[in-house]
């Protein structure tokens, strides 16, 4: 039957009105500035689920409490931001409040964007409003109780939301201040790289000491020489931010690879160097690591000289060595050395294989790596649909034992949880939060009952006094 004519007409009128407003209000220079800032903030990374429909939302953002789906930020008047005024847009970005007054879930890092300047926020708005409008409603979030209640967000904001724009430190250089603004506000690095506190806000006492991005581990990027990036040169840090690859140290995967692809590779050299200058000065936050992640693994050994060929997990009959030879050696080499040009990474002296936890190795096997749009990088295929949990565990254990940190081990049960988007620690955290919320609800109910009882007693006492006075 198609769309009813009145619906088509009203929608067409709305789109025409939006286009007329944009043409008269948005100068080209503001749009150009907004394009750069939108890339720096990596808006497309979370607000695009289908590359052919940029900024239309629907991207699944895994959180410790369930899945949140991103909103449509195209100028569509019905499902996007076409009807948002400038003030409403700023309020959404910096305070996490929708146009209708509802609180936005902090999967959007408005606790970082709160420090952005209003001018930068409005420049981003100008760029977004200049994009083609796309009608695409947002899927419903998948959150268990009590996290599906938006009043919990209001409580979260009371504990964690910062106020006030970034204030430059006049005792520092212009580059340092620019880097601080990019890291702390616009680039919202802490959203992934800072651990969370008891209320699940960013733990400012351990700023940039390492956190999570979904199941992936976001590494410590403080100046600590073992746990962080203190032993990296400025050139290595700049190269990693621009390409996601520093042979002999690290290759970005997961959300970090996508951030390089969508955002960091497009930043100016001055801004990259400013980020490096600021990271150099972030106080060191030590971890539990015995040695730097990239220091594990020797030079590639002779083919088959691994001593771990017998590792198996679960129902799979193939050993880790069998799986590596059949699935990995074509790109990474029989001895894990990668390609000579670095486009296929070496697995020795690699921060992923040398990490203290197995999540990134497992997730790399399950999801692959999207890096093909970055110069000098190649994407890696995902094997999650090919291998069962036991085979993934066997391959991951083979890689860490032969090329990385031999103290790391993962089981088929661990892989099953990661594949489902969870970990044991995350499950415990959710149960603890639910128990806390249930306890708070019981306490609130008890207080209400006590108050009601006292009110009844007060009413009864007043009634008795009235009767007594009446009899007299």
Predicted ranges, named:
Residues 1-30, 68-71, 92, 97-100, ...:
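Post-cleavage N-terminal segment of exported redox proteins
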Residues 30, 42, 85, 116-120, ...:
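An acidic site on a long C-lobe helix of protein kinase domains
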Residues 39-48, 71-72, 87-95, 106, ...:
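C-type cytochrome heme c attachment motif
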Residues 29-49, 54-62, 157, 167-197, ...:
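Sequence/structural segment immediately N-terminal to covalent heme-attachment motifs in c-type
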Residues 59, 67-83, 88, 94-119, ...:
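Axial heme c-ligation environment in periplasmic c-type cytochrome domains
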Residues 56-61, 195-244:
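Active-site substrate-binding loop specific to GH73 endo-beta-N-acetylglucosaminidase modules
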Residues 424-434:
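Short, low-complexity patches enriched in S/T/P/G
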Residues 41-45, 50, 97, 128-135, ...:
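A generic secondary-structure signal for well-formed alpha-helical elements
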């Amino acid at each position: 039957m198609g769309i009813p004519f009145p619906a088509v007409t009203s929608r067409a009128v709305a789109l025409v009105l939006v286009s007329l407003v944009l043409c008269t209000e948005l100068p080209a220079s503001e749009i150009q500035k907004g394009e750069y800032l939108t890339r720096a903030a990596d808006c497309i990374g979370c607000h695009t689920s289908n590359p052919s429909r940029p900024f239309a939302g629907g991207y699944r953002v895994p959180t410790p409490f369930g899945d949140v789906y991103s909103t449509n930020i195209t100028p569509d008047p019905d499902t996007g931001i076409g009807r948002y005024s400038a003030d409403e847009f700023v309020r959404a970005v910096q305070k996490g409040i929708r146009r209708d007054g509802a609180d936005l879930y902090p999967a959007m890092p408005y606790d970082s964007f709160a420090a952005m300047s209003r001018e930068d926020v409005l420049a981003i708005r100008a760029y977004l409003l200049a994009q083609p409008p796309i009608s695409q409603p947002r899927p419903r979030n998948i959150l268990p109780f009590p996290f599906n209640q938006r009043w919990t967000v209001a409580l979260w904001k009371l504990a964690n939301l910062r106020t006030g724009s970034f204030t430059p430190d006049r005792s520092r250089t212009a580059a340092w201040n620019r880097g601080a603004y990019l890291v702390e506000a616009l680039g919202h690095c802490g959203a992934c790289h800072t651990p969370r506190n008891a209320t699940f806000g960013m733990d400012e006492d351990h700023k940039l000491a390492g956190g999570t991005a979904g199941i992936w581990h976001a590494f410590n990027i403080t100046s600590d020489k073992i746990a962080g990036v203190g032993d990296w040169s400025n050139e290595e840090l700049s190269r990693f931010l621009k390409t996601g690859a520093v042979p002999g140290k690290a290759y970005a995967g997961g959300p970090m690879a996508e951030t390089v692809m969508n955002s960091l590779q497009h930043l100016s050299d001055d801004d990259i160097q400013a980020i490096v200058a600021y990271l150099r000065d972030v106080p060191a936050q030590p971890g539990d690591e015995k040695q730097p992640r990239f220091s594990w693994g020797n030079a590639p050994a002779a083919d088959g000289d691994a001593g771990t060929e017998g590792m198996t997990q679960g129902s799979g009959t193939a050993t880790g060595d069998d799986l590596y030879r059949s699935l990995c050696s074509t790109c990474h080499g029989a001895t894990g050395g990668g390609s000579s040009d670095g486009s296929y990474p070496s697995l020795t002296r690699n921060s992923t294989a040398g990490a203290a936890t197995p999540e990134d190795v497992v997730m790399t096997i399950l999801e692959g790596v999207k890096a093909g749009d970055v110069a000098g990088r190649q994407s890696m295929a995902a094997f999650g649909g090919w291998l069962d949990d036991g085979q993934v565990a066997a391959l991951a254990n083979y890689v860490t034992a032969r090329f990385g940190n031999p103290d790391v081990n993962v089981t088929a049960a661990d892989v099953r949880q990661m594949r489902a988007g969870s970990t044991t620690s995350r499950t415990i955290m959710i149960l603890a939060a639910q128990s806390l919320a249930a306890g708070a609800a019981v306490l609130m109910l008890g207080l209400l009952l006590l108050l009601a009882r006292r009110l009844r007693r007060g009413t009864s006492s007043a009634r008795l006094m009235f009767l007594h006075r009446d009899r007299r």
